[in-house]
Amino acid sequence: MVVPHVFLNQRGDIVESYLKAEIEALAFALAPKNKSAVIKMLMKRLRTDAPGAEEGYQDLLKGVDRKPFPSLDGLRNVQRMLKMRTPKIGEIKAEEVIDARIMRKLDDSGFIDRAYAAQGISLK
């Protein structure tokens, strides 16, 4: 999630609510018991067939971080691509724009573990 620092500081409650919903959705999608519902949703929303949805689902299982903390490497990759069109983006120090305090708060409070546990997934 990318938001201006001003928004994060003034409306952190909105950012926190969004991140909670994203984590709960991710936990739902990753739970084996919900696989058929997720496959159906992928087929409908991405307008793909069952094999394509299955491939996407398997990619999700393998590729997504269970605790989606911001990634410095990921941000640098995005920055590298964007600076081709907007060179000034290359001047930004990626490590200065990442702010994981709300994710840290959600993790420290046990929210992330509880969201996964509600879907039958243990992160321990």
Predicted regions and their residues:
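Conserved C-terminal helix/tail region of periplasmic/extracytoplasmic solute-binding proteins
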Residues: K83-K124
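Short glycine- and hydrophobic/aromatic-rich loop-to-beta-strand nucleating segment
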Residues: M1-V2, F7-L8
